[in-house]
Amino acid sequence: MMIAGAEANVEPLVRQSSKPEFGDYQANGAMAAAKKLAMNPREFAQKILDNLDVSDMVDKLEIAGPGFINIFLKPSWLAKQANFALQAVNFGIKTAQPQTILIDYSSPNVAKEMHVGHLRSTIIGDAVVRTLEFLGNNVIRANHVGDWGTQFGMLIAYLEKMENEQASEMQLSDLEAFYRAAKESYDSDQIFAEKARNYVVKLQSGDEYCRTMWKKLVDITMHHNQENYDRLNVTLTEKDVMGESLYNPMLPEIVADLKAKGLAVEDNGAVVVFLDEFKNKDGDPMGVIIQKSDGGFLYTTTDIAAAKYRYETLKVDRALVFSDSRQAQHMQQAWLITRKAGYVPASFSLEHPFFGMMLGKDGKPFKTRSGGTVKLKDLLDEAVERADKLISARSTNLTVAEKSAVVEAVAIGSVKYSDLSKNRTTDYVFDWDNMLTFEGNTAPYMQYAYTRIRSIFARAEIDPDTLTGEMQLTEEKERTLALKLLQFEEALTAVAKEGMPHILCQYLYELAGIFSSFYEACPMLNADEAIKHSRLRLASLTAKTLKQGLDLLGIKTVEKM
């Protein structure tokens, strides 16, 4: 476009075409560029084509409508690129400018068992982490656990009261019972409550006994959480913990600095930042409290410190916080204060890829039948029970070990894929019947699509790595499949940019459908040798892409189902 006279900053706006008659891609940027140059858009589009030589990759370029450029790619070029993708490391995909990116996700509370409310942040965040890493970025995982606050005073005091300092021997379920009992004692026993408050002060001032007990509580919790992460095939480990306690020493200095800069003022004993960008119900600037009148700090203060630390100390280019949509205003306010204070530059990207709620089929927040919170472990156990029934009804030729692996892969995969395949910004209805089925856009369907392709090679006793020759795209179904395979990178780039794994799910589902059409229309094993090898290479690249795509979602594949 620059050759035709467009400014350097004008985007060509190349998009996948919505219909085959419009080509494989459309370039829509000519109209905006022509407007800036006061030219006729179609004439400007023609000027672009007159100065463009892409004959090695393009069959045809045509101008449509007010100035769209339709691009039809050559089958020979598609075949060459697909051949390269099959042989190259990571399909030949790499990021031109890798970044250091921090992903804040999962973030359960210490001394409590993980529940379904932690599921979305954990699996959506992890899918984005995996994708960003695959694209060549340096990714820092940050598990922003709730490991600070008055609850630790209660827990330490109650453990002492029960003469049980062997916290490391306790199961987390005991800790939950301890938490409830400690809260009851705190509410009903003034002497106990005073001791708990004293322990909070001691903990914050570095008292060795309190710090030791606190560390035990954190370690027990994270060990238990790790079991959930491992079972979910999530890449978080205990070394990724960056809890609230990490930022606690920074908070007094931040409050003092915000006051010194005139951003924060004292108001009825509390320290408040008034933001003109947010109005209260009376139309006045909204006050955001960063320190309570009793001296305590708030989540906003911690999030300001976290943003500052991530830029100054970790030196990241982007920081993404995966939490639910109810946190949107809170994050906006914390980051607005962060920027007003000059703690991060405009170039530092602070992003809140929020998600909706997890609902039951009744449209209400997902609960147990008795109305309680569903523990994550219990949810995964039920998934395994249901997946066992699904697989038992279909598969009879699996060994006990094979069946166990299939059941676990389908169970966990179904829970994850059902969520990941939905646009994260919407509320998500959890429905066992819709996720544990081989019909439609589900994990079992996707896992079977992969296994089905692998079985072609197994039955024919062909090692896909031994296939030779170049790909030939003589049939339309072959061409369509090759084009879709080469759009894998585009799907991953969109996930990385938008933090939306459902884009990858939709791509994989469409790929599986296109392969199915190809499989029905284009015989493989009975074709001429050159065609046979070409089609088997396409099948091999499809299997490789499905496996890699599912792996980026944190979903396991199996060789037999």
Swiss-Prot record:
Broad EC category: ligase
Keywords: Aminoacyl-tRNA synthetase, ATP-binding, Cytoplasm, Ligase, Nucleotide-binding, Protein biosynthesis
Keyword Transmembrane: no
Position of sequence motif 'HIGH' region: 108-118
GO terms under biological process: arginyl-tRNA aminoacylation
Subunit structure: Monomer.
Protein name in UniProt: Arginine--tRNA ligase
Species: Haemophilus ducreyi (strain 35000HP / ATCC 700724)
Lineage, broadest ranks: Bacteria, Pseudomonadati, Pseudomonadota, Gammaproteobacteria, Pasteurellales
